Each structure stands twice: as C-alpha cells, then as structure tokens.
C-alpha cells in the first residue's frame, strides 16, 4: 500500500487548496441562542442553479428544485402560463434551450428519478459487510462532537483547549465501539495516526489513490456526510475570519472523516476495490447537469416568472395620493416580511399615518450586554463586525443588578442539581408534587411571558458628539427620513415570544443577529432625542422639529402586540399622541392577526393566535418568513395600499435623495444579501429537507446547547424544521428565488454590482432576480447578467418580445 500522493497532484500546496475549497463549499450554521438564516448554497453561488444541482446530486443526493408534480399542478391551475414557460426557456443557458413548451409540460407530468449521491467507502463497505458503517460513523462522531462543542448543557463537559483533530484522537483511541461493530484495530490505528490533520489527509489521499481532479467533490462529500456538525465548524471559521483570525476545525473534521474511510478501505479492500475505482472516476468527471436537472431548472424559472408577473400586476395598481400634510404618526419597522402585514393594517387606521421600512438593527451595529449579564450579544447582521458596545442599566440600577445575578446563579445551581446524575431521581420523588401547579399552568398555556423589559440601554463607551451626529445622520438618510417629521416617531423592532421552541431565536430579527430588535430601537430613539445631536443634525441640513419625540417599540410577531418603551424618555407633552398611537396599534394588531389566521392551521380566529406562542405542543406558533418572494426598495407610496400578502421585504428608499448612491450601495450589499440568505434558507429547506432542513420538531433534542438532533444523537440538523415550511397537508412556502425590485437608475446599480463581485455573482448566476422600477413604480427592466438589462414590457407577453438587451 503506497503512501505517496498520486502524480496527478501538481504540487504539495494543491492539497491544501482543495481542502480549503471543500470547507468553503459548506455553509455556516449559527448556534441556537443566536441562530440566523443562512443561504445553504453559499459555497456555490459562483455557479448557476443547474450546475449546483449536478454538484449536490453527486455529493449529497440533494435536489435543488421541487418534485415535478409541484410544477405540473401550477401549470394545470394556470398559475404558470405558456408565456412563463417560454420566458424560462429563453432565459436558460444556450445548451439547455433545446426544449419547447410541449416538452416542458410533458416533463412536468413525468417525475424524474431522484438524484443519488456517489457511494462513499463507508457505504461500499456497508454493502459488502451488511454492517451500517455510515450510521456508526454518524453516531460516534455526533457523540464526540456534542461534547467537544458543548456550550454548558452537558453536566460533565469534555476538556477544552485542544484542536478538534487532537481532541477526537484522544477519545477515539480509547473507543472500542467501532471494533465491537467489526472494524479491526481502529483504536490502535487512530493512536498511531499522524499528529496533524494535513498529514493524515495526505496519507489517505495516497492510500485511496485519489487523483487531484476527484478530490474536490469527494472532500465536499465527506463534509456533507457529517451533517450540521460540518456547518457548525464552518461557523467557527466564519467567526474567526470576521475577527481577522483563522480556524482549522472544519479541515480537522475532514481529516477525521477520512480516517474512517481509510480504515474501512483497508479492511474491505478486496470486496470494494473495483467499485471504488469507478467512484473515483465519477468524482473526477466534470460537474455537468443532466437533461433532467436542466429541465427542472427551467421549470423552476417558469414558476418564478409567474410570481414576478403577479408582482408586476400588483405594483402596477393605482397608488393612493402622497400625504401632503404633516404625518400624525411615523413608524419605522424592520423590512421583515411580517412587518408588511402590520404596516398595511396600521396605515388603514388613518391616512395621516406613515410607515417606513428599514433594516431592523436600525443602523447601529452593537455588541450588547443585557441587564445582569456578561454575555456579549452581537445585535447586528452576521456579515458585519460591531462598531459599538452597549449595556442595559447603570449605576442607579447597580443594587438590582447584583440581586438579579445572585438569583440567576441560584436558579442555575438548582437546575444543575435537578439534572445531576446523583440527585435527579431523588429530586423527582421528593419535590415532584410541588411542581404540579406550575406544570398545569405551563401545559395549559396560562403563563404569559412579558416582553423584554431591561433598563434603558446605553452606549459604553459613549461616542463623542461628532460621532453621534454622524451616526444619526447616516441612519436617517439611509431610511430616507430627513424631513417632514411627525410629532411622534416610533422605531419598532420585532421579536417573538414563544415557549418550548429550540429555534425561538430564528423567529427574532435576522438583522439583529437572531435577537429581538428592541435594544437597537431604544438606542436610536435615545440618540435622536438628544438635543446636542439634533443641533448637529440641523447644521448638516436635517431639521427635526422641537416637538418631535422618538419612542422605541417592540412588535411581537406571534401576537401582533406592540410594546412601547415610554420610560426611556418620558414626555408629558406627548401623552395624547401616545394614547392615540396605542389605539391605532391595538386595532392594527387585530387586523394583522385576522389576516395571518387565514394562513395558520387550526387558527379559528385572531383571538386564537396569542395562545399559540404559549402552547408547549404548538409546532407552528407563527409562519415567520415562510412565503417570502420579493424585496422592494422604493418610496412607500409605490406599495402603500397594495396587499403583498406578507411576502415582501419592504425597504424605503428615495434615490433622488441619495446623491452619491451610497445608500443604494448599502442596500445592495447588506439588506439584499441578508434577505437572500433568508429566502434561500427557506428554499433549501423546502426543496431538499433531508439535506438542508432541520428535520421534524417532534423528534428534536437539543445537544450541546448549540443545535438539535433527531432522536438520541447522531448528526446535527441545520436549516428550518419541516413544520416551518409545511402545514401537514400542503407547502406553506413556495420555494422561489427572491425578486429584488429597486427604484433607482440602472447605471447606478450596474456600477455598484461591478464593484462587488460576490453580490454580482448572486444576480449573474440567478440566485437572485433584479428589476429596476420606472418613475411610476412599475417593473420595467430586468437585469440580464453581465451588467446588462432587458426591457421587459408586458410580463404576460411571449418571451421573444422581451429579449432586447441594453448595456448601461
């Protein structure tokens, strides 16, 4: 058996490069405490959907489109028209245009064979021996990884401080489970393995005879077989690089997985050698979509064209006249699709109410410490680093801070006592009856958790006046709020108040890093109520009237209740304004709940919705962002009074106030990217739930405090649970790539895309669709890739009439 790397490798550095590429093909997964949506195709956005479909079929047996019956049903119902099919064919790569409408219709009614991944050595060995080696690997790796990554859940945590590869070797060298299952001398082989991950990868590549052109997809497959553990390791690398460092965990994982492959290959060489040679050859072949995958990609494009046609019709509807008088109330909400329903309901209360859409972190990238806590919460988009630090409370709350810390420690100690191996059984026998009342109250949903009510947050250290003025000006200009201020302006963050839900943070604000948005809203309200800051803004051309008062609020997206943080900045002069605002918000909440109840299973009326978040057994307290289809950056008058069904991210933007297009650049590179992550996570969890979905909530167990497994162990599940995209009978989410509609000059958008290759790749390769709105707010131009635009005219027209390309 040779230990020499095959001659197809050009140089020693090539192996490191391929290992790194495989690692970056895995998307990161954030821990449960601050989980955010992640694009599961993050490592493949340089390729179009069909090619990624071929790649993921090879390494994971994953689909990237829906089953064909889904498209067939939409064609039969008239949702997808012949014009949509023609447009999809016309927009397909040249090599995929050898189909016509008739072919597509026939294909939609004939389900293609599901993709099947190339077999791993573990699978070949399982076939040869009858032993479930992939299952054993998943179970043993998961048991070790749960302890290695533990964030405080385990009572007996694994030792910290070692790199993943070294820590695993220390455990695996004494783990006899593989040998009991039939893998001879595995523990001994692990103890004698090279000391570094790179050295073991070099040895395995040599022993398996793995050529260079086969390694990338094979290494990618190895990491995919580790499920969410590889995703969490990728998160460690993401966080390290964001801070300017590095992390080797994910390449250590690759080495660990390859040790298993090597051991199984050595034991079953005679039985599987011929099959392995065929697998190697298949891995070395270029990644190209099959005809079935190409057809599926065209059907997917047709479904998206149909949705865009419906959106264009909605945007073309008559808009109400713009408000000329001073608004009675201005409310700035997060761009989250759930806010669209509430904003529309609130605006229906009075024509003098103006709502604004802006990213829910309100432009303040802060690392925050909650009251009586030393935990740093990064309340900002995960793409960014915090520029500010903040905390809740101050010297006046010191005594309460200390008493709260003592109570928290006591609760933690009591909780660990209840779960400890020695005391847990005696605890249940001795104190079980005492908990009957609490158990009944919780089980019946009688306990109502209050909204976050920490003392007013403050920046620490406090920036100087010039910085505070600059920050305030940047935020106001970014939300196009520079004039015509109301007497009362609300900054409304959002969160979700739910119980018995490990994925609760996924219901919070993605722009706030998986936390609720009240901290950022309260900080901004404090900043703009500062008289010195207002004076600086006035000198810079933003005149805020003396009678304008800013108040922070929190929208509970499960109940549609809104909490106002009035104690931060009490104002007797605005008592009447606040009472009226409360009435409007309460009425709007009822309207929003009524609309949302139509989509939720077993929601008989709006009154039943608040109970869902308190119900232990409720797997769907709300739909969160299911159904998201569009991102619209334009003045609110373009969408006001038009029902977008809670399916659109709405960002206020007036390009005529954006002289340098710096706000446009910010929108394209931050909110649009975050929205794409959300949209594509829902997409991936729907089309490939076994690979990119979070599994079944009914089977979830939290492990390590960082994620969930199904059952008693094994692979970490990432992505959205099935109950988040399906109501038990039908899909709650139509997996459509996001349509981004922006009212701005095409030249400006092209120039920005030209400066940001990663963002441009999302549009050039079809992971996002980009449209330019005209001066009437209608979808007039489609981005055609390569910094070119197509005039789209009537979206109902056949595609041939839409092929005019204009370079700008």
From Swiss-Prot:
Secreted as UniProt keyword: no
Entry's Gene Ontology molecular function annotations: zinc ion binding
Protein family per UniProt: Belongs to the inorganic carbon transporter (TC 9.A.2) DabA family.
Subunit architecture: Forms a complex with DabB.
PANTHER family: INORGANIC CARBON TRANSPORTER SUBUNIT DABA-RELATED, UPF0753 PROTEIN AQ_863
One GO cellular component, as annotated: plasma membrane
Native organism: Acidiphilium cryptum (strain JF-5)
Keywords per UniProt: Cell inner membrane, Cell membrane, Membrane, Metal-binding, Transport, Zinc
Listed name of the protein: Probable inorganic carbon transporter subunit DabA
InterPro entries in alphabetical order: DabA
Pfam family, one: DabA
Species lineage: Bacteria, Pseudomonadati, Pseudomonadota, Alphaproteobacteria, Acetobacterales
Binding site for Zn(2+): 334, 336, 494, 509
């Amino acid at each position: 058996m040779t230990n020499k790397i095959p001659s197809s490798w050009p140089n020693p550095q090539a192996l490191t490069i391929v290992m790194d590429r495989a690692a970056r093909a895995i998307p990161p997964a954030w821990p449960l405490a601050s989980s955010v949506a992640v694009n599961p195709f993050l490592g493949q956005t340089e390729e179009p959907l069909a090619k990624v479909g071929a790649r993921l079929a090879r390494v994971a047996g994953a689909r990237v489109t829906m089953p064909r019956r889904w498209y067939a049903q939409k064609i039969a119902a008239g949702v997808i028209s012949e014009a949509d099919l023609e447009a999809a064919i016309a927009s397909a790569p040249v090599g995929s245009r050898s189909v016509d409408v008739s072919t597509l219709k026939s294909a939609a009614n004939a389900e293609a064979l599901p993709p099947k991944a190339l077999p791993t050595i573990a699978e070949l060995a399982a076939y040869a021996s009858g032993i479930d080696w992939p299952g054993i690997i998943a179970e043993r790796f998961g048991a070790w990884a749960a302890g290695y990554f533990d964030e405080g859940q385990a009572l007996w945590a694994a030792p910290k401080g070692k790199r993943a590869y070294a820590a695993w070797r220390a455990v695996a060298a004494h783990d006899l489970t593989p040998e009991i299952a039939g893998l001879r001398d595995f523990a001994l082989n692990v103890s004698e393995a090279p000391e570094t991950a790179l050295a073991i990868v070099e040895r395995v590549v040599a022993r398996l005879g793995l050529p260079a052109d086969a390694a990338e997809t094979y290494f990618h497959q190895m990491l995919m077989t580790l499920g969410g553990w590889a995703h969490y390791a990728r998160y460690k690398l993401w966080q390290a690089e964001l801070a300017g460092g590095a992390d080797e965990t994910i390449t250590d994982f690759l080495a660990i997985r390859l040790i298993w492959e090597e051991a199984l290959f050595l034991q079953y060489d005679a039985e599987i050698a011929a099959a392995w040679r065929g697998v190697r050859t298949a891995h070395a072949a270029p990644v190209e979509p099959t005809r079935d995958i190409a057809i599926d990609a065209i059907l997917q494009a047709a479904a998206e064209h149909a949705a865009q046609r419906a959106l264009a019709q909605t945007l073309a509807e008559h808009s109400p006249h713009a408000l000329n008088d001073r608004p009675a109330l201005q409310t700035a909400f997060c761009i989250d699709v759930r806010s669209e329903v509430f904003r529309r309901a609130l605006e229906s209360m009075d024509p003098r109410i103006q709502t604004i859409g802006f990213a829910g972190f309100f432009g303040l990238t802060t690392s925050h410490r909650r009251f009586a806590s030393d935990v740093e919460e990064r309340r900002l988009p995960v793409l960014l680093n915090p520029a500010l630090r903040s905390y809740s409370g101050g010297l006046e709350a010191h005594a309460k801070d200390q008493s709260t810390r003592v109570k928290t420690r006591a609760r933690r100690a009591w909780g660990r006592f209840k779960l400890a191996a020695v005391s847990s059984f005696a605890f249940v026998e001795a104190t079980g009856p005492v908990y009957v009342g609490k158990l009944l109250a919780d089980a019946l949903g009688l306990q109502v958790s209050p909204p976050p009510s920490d003392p007013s947050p403050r920046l620490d250290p406090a920036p100087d006046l010039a910085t505070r003025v600059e920050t305030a000006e940047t935020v106001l200009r970014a939300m196009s709020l520079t004039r015509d201020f109301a007497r009362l302006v609300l900054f409304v963050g959002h969160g979700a108040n739910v119980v018995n839900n490990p994925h609760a943070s996924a219901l919070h604000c993605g722009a706030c890093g998986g936390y609720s948005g009240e901290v950022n809203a309260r900080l901004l309200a404090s900043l703009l109520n500062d008289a010195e800051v207002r004076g600086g803004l006035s000198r810079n051309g933003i005149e805020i009237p003396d009678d304008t008062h800013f108040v922070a609020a929190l929208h509970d997206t499960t109940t549609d209740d809104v909490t106002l943080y009035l104690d931060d900045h009490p104002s007797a002069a605005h008592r009447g304004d606040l009472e009226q605002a409360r009435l409007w918000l309460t009425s709007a909440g009822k309207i929003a709940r009524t609309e949302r109840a139509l989509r939720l299973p077993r929601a008989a009326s709006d009154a039943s919705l608040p109970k869902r978040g308190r119900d232990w057994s409720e797997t769907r307290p709300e739909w969160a962002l299911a159904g998201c289809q569009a991102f619209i950056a334009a003045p609110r008058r373009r969408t006001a009074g038009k029902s977008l069904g809670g399916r659109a991210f709405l960002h206020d933007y007036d390009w005529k106030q954006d002289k340098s297009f710096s706000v446009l650049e910010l929108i394209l590179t931050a909110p649009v990217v975050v929205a794409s992550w959300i949209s594509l996570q829902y997409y991936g969890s729907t089309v490939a739930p076994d690979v990119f979905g979070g599994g079944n909530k009914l089977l979830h167990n939290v492990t390590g405090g960082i994620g969930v497994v199904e059952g008693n162990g094994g692979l970490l599940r990432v992505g959205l649970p099935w109950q988040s995209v399906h109501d038990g009978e039908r899909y709650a989410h139509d997996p459509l790539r996001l349509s981004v509609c922006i009212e701005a000059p095409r030249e400006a958008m092209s120039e920005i895309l030209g400066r940001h290759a990663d963002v441009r790749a999302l549009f050039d390769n079809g992971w996002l669709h980009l449209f330019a709105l005209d001066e009437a707010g209608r979808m007039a131009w489609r981005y055609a890739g390569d910094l070119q635009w197509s005039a789209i005219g009537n979206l109902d027209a056949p595609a041939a009439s839409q092929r005019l390309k204009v370079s700008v």
